[in-house]
């Protein structure tokens, strides 16, 4: 690509957002449901799946810290009441360790993960694009997420939906 055009759209100032944290033992079910859910979610909703060891989040019991988890990071940029209907569907993916979901300024949500990416920690990101999460890929994600070399490592699947998912190359 040598050039592309994009159009900005207003967001917020507030969005419905947060995390739902599931035990890693439920990874296959949660990730499979996530994959199917993202195929039909509305443009106002974005959900990322993260597999990692639990950081010391204040809404998780202390005995969960350091355990393998699957996280759904949710952001709904529309009417919060409508967004809660989608959050409720995500809650049904399994039996969560905990969650922290609510309305907050978009600029706060945009920075919420910054403490996990501290300067000097040699952050390295590598990406691949997939049109869908097939069962074999889900199994591979689970296999490697179960063997991450440090508590700072994670595997995440970021959805790029909306118009980008509907536009043909």
Q: Across the structure, where does each feature detected by a protein language model lie?
A:
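Soluble FAD-dependent oxygen oxidases
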Residues: 1-169
């Amino acid at each position: 690509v040598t050039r592309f055009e994009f159009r900005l759209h207003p967001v917020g100032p507030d969005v419905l957002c947060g995390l739902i944290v599931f035990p890693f033992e439920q990874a296959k079910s949660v990730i499979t449901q996530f994959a199917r859910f993202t195929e039909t979610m509305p443009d106002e909703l974005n959900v990322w799946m993260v597999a990692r060891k639990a950081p010391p989040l204040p809404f998780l019991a202390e005995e969960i810290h350091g355990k393998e988890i699957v996280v759904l990071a949710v952001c709904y940029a529309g009417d919060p009441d409508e967004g809660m209907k989608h959050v409720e569907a995500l809650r049904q993916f399994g039996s969560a360790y905990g969650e922290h979901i609510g309305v907050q300024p978009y600029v706060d949500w945009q920075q919420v993960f910054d403490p996990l990416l501290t300067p000097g920690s040699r952050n390295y990101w590598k990406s691949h694009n997939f049109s869908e999460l097939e069962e074999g890929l889900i199994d591979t994600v689970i296999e490697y997420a179960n063997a991450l070399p440090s508590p700072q490592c994670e595997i995440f699947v970021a959805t790029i939906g909306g118009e980008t998912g509907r536009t043909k190359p």
